[in-house]
Amino acid sequence: MNSKTFYPTLIFSFLILLGFCFGGCAATRKEIYIPLNPEVDRLPIYRKFSVQAALLISEEDKKYVYKGTPSGSLLTNLVHVFPLGDALENGSLQMFSQIFRNIQVVRTPAEAKKFKIVIAPQIEDFNFRYDEAGDYYLRMGDSRYIVPTAAVKVKITIYSEGTAVWEKGVKSPEEKKPVPYNPGFANAKEIGEVVCQALDYALKRMAEEIAQDPEVEKNAASLSIDGLAKTFAQHRVDYQPGLPGTGERL
C-alpha cells in the first residue's frame, strides 16, 4: 500500500475508533438489534421423499439470541443482538421442505414421535466482525467502506425410530459484503444479510447430501420416532462485556 492510500486508511480507522470511544465513555455500551430474514437458495433436486418430517427445535433453541461484540478491531464497543434461533428455524423450514413432502415444527421429542423422520438442527458456532475495505473501495470518491463478515457452523441430526441415521456439521466460509460506512452505525441490514448468507450455505450443503443419502431414503418409510428423551438445547458461551466475539442466551 503506498502513502496515498495508507494515510487515508489510517485516518479512517482512527476516526471510527475515536468516535465510538467517546460515545462509549458518555453512555453505556450501545446495543443494536440485527434483523435476520433468511431466504434460502433453491436446491437442484427433482424429487422429494414421500414422507412428512418433523423439524425438532426446542422452545429454548427457538428463542436463542446471540448477544456479543465483533471480533477484530472495528466497532468492538457495539453489542450486536442476533436472533439466531428464529433464523435457524425459518431457514431450515425453507430448505428441508424442498426434499420432504411436508415439514412440521415440533418442540419436544414427545411431539416428534408421530413422525417417521425427525430433523434436529443446531447452531454450533458463530462469529462475526468488520474488516477495513481494500484499496479499490477506499479510492471510490469520498465514501469510506467497511466489510461486514460472518461465518456460522450448523449441525443436523436425522432420527428414524429413535436412532440417528445421519449426522453432520458444516461451517460456512466467511461471507463478506463491502458497504459504505455510516457514522453512528446504520449497517444492521447488511450484517444481517451476511449472516443469512452464511446460514444458507451451511443448510444447503447438508440438504443436498441428505437428499442423496441412501440411509435416509431407506428410513424415510420407517414407523415412528422413539427414545428422543434428551434436550436439544446446546451449550452457549456466556457473554462477557469487553470480550469480543462472545455471546449469551437471552
Predicted segment positions?
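Bacterial N-terminal signal peptides that target proteins for export
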Residues: M1-F12
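Bacterial N-terminal signal peptides
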Residues: I11-C21
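A structural "domain/chain start" motif
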Residues: G24-Q94, E208-L250
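Surface-exposed short loop/turn segments
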Residues: A26-I34, V106-V165, P244-R249
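Generic short beta-strand segments
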Residues: I57-K63, Q122-E132, K171-K177
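Short secondary-structure boundary motifs at beta->alpha junctions and helix caps
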Residues: P70-P83, V147, Y159-Q212
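A structural motif corresponding to the C-terminal end of an alpha-helix
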Residues: E89-V105, E161
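Surface-exposed patches in mature extracellular/periplasmic domains of secreted proteins
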Residues: N102-E111, E217-S222
